[in-house]
């Protein structure tokens, strides 16, 4: 699990810090050197058809994609944990109604809902991660609900209730800490899914707006230039695939680690 996380951490650090020391901003235009080649005129990866530095845009695009992915995943964690914990703890008719709502939302075309939110409320980076996170919480809610229902009949929970602990306090102090490990595992698996969704939306032009950029936007732009500048597509595409694979591997290894601990 460490190696994939190290790769993602290094990519995140590079995307955060290197734009601060580059001589060109991601939206700054070098009118004198449009379509500059590699290592020409102070541009390590050259410039695009508008004279913008490719390296700066690649770093900022990576930063934007990762920021949206982690923020949206956190939104899904919060919503899913609250909903699932409430349903599992209350139980009965309330639990049935709440989970039927989740089942109904599962039946909706996920991508259509996100695109509809972008069209109705406009495009902004805030709305992107809220919109994606607001529809990615369904699996998290089911996972948390199952864990809460399994834990609330355990002896340490019954002992807390027998000692006079209020229901809300028992849930927060005794059950949720034991659910955290599983929730984090599924959070780590949610992040690469959000990366793919955000990149797809940006590829379609429904993600973040210029002058901000993301890996999806860069892949879209690179596809038009692939014949002349293959690196314009290969670099953002390679970074995107690497991030998705590393995050998926890390999440699966952490989930397997939890499963091994639970079986002991």
State the predicted function of each range.
Residues 18-21, 68-103, 115:
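Transmembrane-helix boundary motif in ABC transporter permease subunits
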Residues 52-67, 71, 91-99, 149-153, ...:
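Amphipathic cytosolic juxtamembrane alpha-helices at the membrane-cytosol interface
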Residues 64-80, 107-115, 177, 181-198, ...:
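Hydrophobic alpha-helical transmembrane segments in multi-pass membrane proteins
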